[in-house]
Amino acid sequence: MNLLIDNWIPVRPRNGGKVQIINLQSLYCSRDQWRLSLPRDDMELAALALLVCIGQIIAPAKDDVEFRHRIMNPLTEDEFQQLIAPWIDMFYLNHAEHPFMQTKGVKANDVTPMEKLLAGVSGATNCAFVNQPGQGEALCGGCTAIALFNQANQAPGFGGGFKSGLRGGTPVTTFVRGIDLRSTVLLNVLTLPRLQKQFPNESHTENQPTWIKPIKSNESIPASSIGFVRGLFWQPAHIELCDPIGIGKCSCCGQESNLRYTGFLKEKFTFTVNGLWPHPHSPCLVTVKKGEVEEKFLAFTTSAPSWTQISRVVVDKIIQNENGNRVAAVVNQFRNIAPQSPLELIMGGYRNNQASILERRHDVLMFNQGWQQYGNVINEIVTVGLGYKTALRKALYTFAEGFKNKDFKGAGVSVHETAERHFYRQSELLIPDVLANVNFSQADEVIADLRDKLHQLCEMLFNQSVAPYAHHPKLISTLALARATLYKHLRELKPQGGPSNG
């Protein structure tokens, strides 16, 4: 199977209909409007990322004019064939010498089942997800390619002795969403000038993918020596698919396939990458420690909802107080090419504990027209939301722990943790809606209304949290102190001169 020629992309019509498996030419050369259709959101994100990376190497626009033209107009079949011709040999999943995302000649005592390529399907945290039984039993070529790419670039490594991708084990991936799959893919392909800016030393890098020019064992690799093709399709693990079985239904996408893969070989392999490779699909955090600049890609490290990270995802921040961030290059490109357009942002990834997946994350966040110019308003909305969360948590922490030096007994129950989860759940109905609809140039009234709603939410959650203990004689003083703490913090969150409740 060749990813540039054969049918492997699972889609359904944008307005509903049956799942179909199409090829890359059908995607690029037709006005049919498709959306990806896989049973798992992380596999859909991985499929999109794979399509974007393929698009980045075969079809980067030469300038903004060509970029806009390609969004609006499908390629002709001749144009498409010319674009893929130099790359065809690189994308055979079952190539005799250099199969896609694999290493030939892997030595392993046991065959690893395909479910190990599907993040979170097997292992101790499987119960945290809704997984169909047998989902990793036998995968078609398309789902196998998607899973290989996902494991290498967007999921944690296999554990001890195996490396994760260039962005770390659980990077946050961000993409601009278009009206359909074709436009979404093309919106996230950097133009040639932006690609050259992202990778200024490209002519001095190694740019063959790892399955054609393998990484050497124990090699020390400067990140700056990795070309954009090699980096986008980085494979840190030694994996080799076993021979496929015959025709049948793919256990992942559910479609009939002539060949299905049931297992693979893997072996431990180590090397070191020095520095940060400038991946165009992820926001980057910058910190200064002891005068040294440290960079790392944004990751989901807590269960806090995606809105808490928005200011890091769409607003560049120069280093202040030893912290800063850069948004993903694909988001910055859209900001510059479409300065008056609203933004639909796909944001996804995993939260993990070492090699175990704790949570899959996949959100679409909407930003009204004006988001490009009003990063300060976006920052304020996020800061307001986090401020009220902190006020509630501090007050309930006081109630839970008490004050030993003042002889106030605590409830001894982590009500602050439970209330924080409820706050986040409720805030996901409020804050994303504000960002999607706010008139950024006249945001004061909307932010004031948000403050009022969050104030009321804090009061409600505080009262719900303490209600079971309200009549406990030894907690009456502690409750009064905790309530006073809540209103103290809520008053501090009011703008100067604003009214206060309590």
From Swiss-Prot:
One of its GO terms (molecular function) is zinc ion binding. One of its GO terms (biological process) is defense response to virus. It holds the Pfam family CRISPR_Cse1. The keyword RNA-binding applies. Disruption phenotype: Loss of resistance to bacteriophage lambda infection, loss of plasmid silencing. Keywords: Antiviral defense, DNA-binding, RNA-binding. One of its GO terms (cellular component) is protein-containing complex. Induction: Repressed by H-NS, activated by LeuO. Activated by the BaeSR two-component regulatory system, possibly due to envelope stress. Part of the casABCDE-ygbT-ygbF operon. Part of the Cascade ribonucleoprotein complex, with stoichiometry CasA(1),CasB(2),CasC(6),CasD(1),CasE(1)-crRNA(1). Interacts directly with the 5' end of crRNA, CasB, CasD and CasE. Binding of target ssRNA or dsDNA causes a conformational change in the Cascade complex; CasA is required for high affinity target DNA binding. Interacts with Cas3 once Cascade has recognized target DNA. CRISPR (clustered regularly interspaced short palindromic repeat), is an adaptive immune system that provides protection against mobile genetic elements (viruses, transposable elements and conjugative plasmids). CRISPR clusters contain sequences complementary to antecedent mobile elements and target invading nucleic acids. CRISPR clusters are transcribed and processed into CRISPR RNA (crRNA). NCBIfam families: casA_cse1 (TIGR02547), PRK09693.1 (NF007247). Belongs to the CRISPR associated protein CasA/Cse1 family. Type I-E/Ecoli subfamily. This is CRISPR system Cascade subunit CasA. The gene is casA.
